[in-house]
Amino acid sequence: MTAAAEPTAVPVAPPLQVAIYDDVVAARGEQFRIPGLAVTVFAHADDAVAQCLTAGYDVVFMDYALGPGRRVGTEVTRALRAAGFRGKVVAISSDPAANAAIRAAGADSSLAQKALLRSYLVHLGRAPLNP
């Protein structure tokens, strides 16, 4: 009698760590439970540099206007890059000019419409992150 072969465990990649800095998404209480991603939503980005460097986020989605008296997305993106953050930054303002400003401050890309955020996240969860 031949012993059955033990199933080989397939290594599972850890989920991508994703931060979303958007006051409206946070106010709506939106939650993103997407396979392959661990998503955290923040209402403002005042502490984004410390949060991103400590938590090791792979991807950061950054809005421009994050509420009265709060740091704006361009300032935060510039500070992230100056602090050595090497993850991807994606601008998610509904205003194309604001997205362009965030890109000029160091973001890698932008979403044309914030309404596409969930679809983009689903795609990101399915595809490996390119270096």
Name each model feature, range by range.
Residues V24-R28, A65-G69, P96-A98:
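Short acidic, S/G/P-rich loop/turn micro-motifs used as interaction or catalytic elements
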Residues V60-L80:
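Conserved phosphotransfer microenvironments
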Residues V90-I92:
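Hydrophobic/aromatic residues positioned on beta-strands within the core alpha/beta folds
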Residues M1-I34, A38, A115-P131:
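Non-catalytic signal-transmission and effector/linker regions of two-component phosphorelay proteins
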Residues R71, S94-A115, S119:
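Alpha4 helix (beta4-alpha4-beta5 surface) of REC/receiver domains from two-component response regulators
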Residues V41-V59, D63-G67:
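Acidic, metal-coordinating helix/loop segments flanking the phosphotransfer/catalytic sites
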Residues I34-L37, F85, A104-A107:
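Short, structured coil segments at secondary-structure junctions
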Residues L53-A55, A79-R86, A105:
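Conserved phosphotransfer cores of two-component systems
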